[in-house]
Amino acid sequence: MILKLMAGILLLTVCLEGCSSQHWSYGLRPGGKRNTEHLVESFQEMGKEVDQMAEPQHFECTVHWPRSPLRDLRGALESLIEEEARQKKM
């Protein structure tokens, strides 16, 4: 009972903390008001970020995984099942 109560209080605290926080970016001030002196600069920054996101990014996997023994076992079982199915058809 005490464990459930503590977990509930912890969950409530985390939720309230997340809901009460405010994200400020691109010249926003408390209350959602923009700094009008730097408004053009804010939009230019946003435009640059959008252009950067539009460029495709290519990633290559450089990790070579060793051959899994489970994969070999699966292949052997599949071939046995196929062979038995062919023998039953004959």
Curated annotation (Swiss-Prot):
<feature type="site" description="Cleavage; by ACE">
    <location>
        <begin position="26"/>
        <end position="27"/>
    </location>
</feature>
<comment type="function">
    <text>Stimulates the secretion of gonadotropins; it stimulates the secretion of both luteinizing and follicle-stimulating hormones.</text>
</comment>
<dbReference type="GO" id="GO:0043066">
    <property type="term" value="P:negative regulation of apoptotic process"/>
</dbReference>
<dbReference type="GO" id="GO:0043679">
    <property type="term" value="C:axon terminus"/>
</dbReference>
<dbReference type="GO" id="GO:0035864">
    <property type="term" value="P:response to potassium ion"/>
</dbReference>
<dbReference type="GO" id="GO:0032496">
    <property type="term" value="P:response to lipopolysaccharide"/>
</dbReference>
<dbReference type="InterPro" id="IPR019792">
    <property type="entry name" value="Gonadoliberin"/>
</dbReference>
<dbReference type="InterPro" id="IPR004079">
    <property type="entry name" value="Gonadoliberin_I_precursor"/>
</dbReference>
<dbReference type="GO" id="GO:1990008">
    <property type="term" value="C:neurosecretory vesicle"/>
</dbReference>
<feature type="site" description="Cleavage; by ACE">
    <location>
        <begin position="28"/>
        <end position="29"/>
    </location>
</feature>
<feature type="site" description="Cleavage; by ACE">
    <location>
        <begin position="31"/>
        <end position="32"/>
    </location>
</feature>
<dbReference type="GO" id="GO:0044849">
    <property type="term" value="P:estrous cycle"/>
</dbReference>
<dbReference type="InterPro" id="IPR002012">
    <property type="entry name" value="GnRH"/>
</dbReference>
<dbReference type="GO" id="GO:0007565">
    <property type="term" value="P:female pregnancy"/>
</dbReference>
<keyword id="KW-0027">Amidation</keyword>
<keyword id="KW-0165">Cleavage on pair of basic residues</keyword>
<dbReference type="GO" id="GO:1990637">
    <property type="term" value="P:response to prolactin"/>
</dbReference>
<dbReference type="GO" id="GO:0030238">
    <property type="term" value="P:male sex determination"/>
</dbReference>
<feature type="modified residue" description="Glycine amide">
    <location>
        <position position="31"/>
    </location>
</feature>
<dbReference type="GO" id="GO:0005615">
    <property type="term" value="C:extracellular space"/>
</dbReference>
<keyword id="KW-0964">Secreted</keyword>
<keyword id="KW-0732">Signal</keyword>
<dbReference type="GO" id="GO:0034695">
    <property type="term" value="P:response to prostaglandin E"/>
</dbReference>
<dbReference type="GO" id="GO:0045471">
    <property type="term" value="P:response to ethanol"/>
</dbReference>
<dbReference type="GO" id="GO:2000354">
    <property type="term" value="P:regulation of ovarian follicle development"/>
</dbReference>
<dbReference type="GO" id="GO:0010468">
    <property type="term" value="P:regulation of gene expression"/>
</dbReference>
<keyword id="KW-0372">Hormone</keyword>
<dbReference type="GO" id="GO:0005798">
    <property type="term" value="C:Golgi-associated vesicle"/>
</dbReference>
<dbReference type="GO" id="GO:0030425">
    <property type="term" value="C:dendrite"/>
</dbReference>
<comment type="similarity">
    <text>Belongs to the GnRH family.</text>
</comment>
<dbReference type="GO" id="GO:0043204">
    <property type="term" value="C:perikaryon"/>
</dbReference>
<feature type="modified residue" description="Pyrrolidone carboxylic acid">
    <location>
        <position position="22"/>
    </location>
</feature>
<feature type="site" description="Cleavage; by ACE">
    <location>
        <begin position="24"/>
        <end position="25"/>
    </location>
</feature>
<dbReference type="GO" id="GO:0098556">
    <property type="term" value="C:cytoplasmic side of rough endoplasmic reticulum membrane"/>
</dbReference>
<dbReference type="GO" id="GO:0033574">
    <property type="term" value="P:response to testosterone"/>
</dbReference>
<dbReference type="GO" id="GO:0048545">
    <property type="term" value="P:response to steroid hormone"/>
</dbReference>
<dbReference type="Pfam" id="PF00446">
    <property type="entry name" value="GnRH"/>
</dbReference>
<dbReference type="GO" id="GO:0033087">
    <property type="term" value="P:negative regulation of immature T cell proliferation"/>
</dbReference>
<protein>
    <recommendedName>
        <fullName>Progonadoliberin-1</fullName>
    </recommendedName>
</protein>
<feature type="signal peptide">
    <location>
        <begin position="1"/>
        <end position="21"/>
    </location>
</feature>
<feature type="site" description="Appears to be essential for biological activity">
    <location>
        <position position="24"/>
    </location>
</feature>
<keyword id="KW-0873">Pyrrolidone carboxylic acid</keyword>
